[in-house]
Design a protein with these regions (language model features):
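Conserved ABC transporter NBD signature motif
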Residues: 70-78, 87
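Catalytic Walker B motif of ABC-type/P-loop ATPase nucleotide-binding domains
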Residues: 173-177
């Protein structure tokens, strides 16, 4: 067995607990003693059932939420010590849903994705222009630059959102179920583009995904969040086993092979 190569830590969640106070005065625990480390250049898929705390974990990494217990670090410093604009530039988020303003062209929206960290509406410096142009190219959105956002298809809209995130020139890219509104062909295309960007830019990527086979094909490392805890973390073949899937997701699956020999999970035939 080949030993794993250690990478320099970029972000870490250590012993983190988080919960919400409900309207009736009770407390709902969402995360319980979560541990997750992301090295520079890591590509990790985060999977779990609905309500297991995946989106909450992303919000803790952005500093939008603060943990009730434990520590969240980015680049060696507690997230709480970072100035929000500084952290927001280095940690980009591709959300499940983002309401875009009407009447703006794609290039203008990508400029907005770059500019808020400089306290202005549109990018204006030469460095801004280079970052916006590169973001459009890397996201495969150059041909969309003069289109209005409301004219875009689902797949084109996702390319716009990727470009807006890349315009920040982040170190960490967080994806919250980026494929949820796409058909299979566009899901595969988007994830392939993210893989390419990770390799090209050296990004660290943490992607919340709901399709286990897509997660296994996308990332060399998969973490499973169940009932507020990371219950498995490692290569897909070690983590996404039939017994783990049955225990966490309550679904009976079998390991199968595609025609070209790739492993995948198939529903168990009764």
């Amino acid at each position: 067995m080949t030993a794993a190569v250690a990478t320099e830590e970029l972000a870490a969640v250590e012993g983190v607990a988080f919960g919400y106070r409900l309207s009736d005065g009770n407390h709902r625990d969402v995360l319980r003693s979560v541990n997750l480390t992301l090295g520079r250049g890591d590509l990790v898929a985060l999977v779990g059932t609905n309500g297991s705390g995946k989106t909450t974990l992303l919000r803790l990494l952005t500093g939008i939420l603060q943990p009730d217990a434990g520590a969240v670090r980015f680049d060696g410093r507690p997230v709480a010590e970072w100035r929000r604009p500084e952290l927001a530039r280095r940690v980009a988020v591709l959300p499940q849903q983002l309401d875009l303003p009407v009447g703006f062209r794609v290039a203008e929206l990508v400029e907005m994705g770059r500019a808020p960290h400089a306290r202005r509406l549109f990018a204006s410096t030469e460095a801004d222009a280079r970052a916006v142009s590169r973001a459009l190219a890397d996201a495969g959105a150059l041909e969309l630059a003069d289109r209005y956002a409301e004219e875009l298809s689902g797949g084109e809209r996702q390319r716009l959102l990727v470009a807006m995130a890349l315009a920040q020139e982040p170190d960490l890219l967080l994806l919250d179920e980026p494929t949820v509104h796409l058909d299979l062909a566009h899901q595969v295309a988007l994830l392939a583009a993210i893989q390419h960007l990770r390799d090209q830019r050296g990004l660290t990527v943490l992607a919340v995904l709901h399709d286990l086979n897509l997660a296994a094909a996308f990332a060399p490392r998969v973490a499973i969040l169940d009932d507020g805890r990371i219950v498995a973390d490692g290569p897909p073949g070690d983590v996404l086993t039939p017994d783990v899937v049955q225990r966490v997701f309550g679904v009976a699956v079998d390991e199968a092979r595609t025609a070209d020999g790739r492993r995948h999970l198939a529903l168990h035939e009764v």
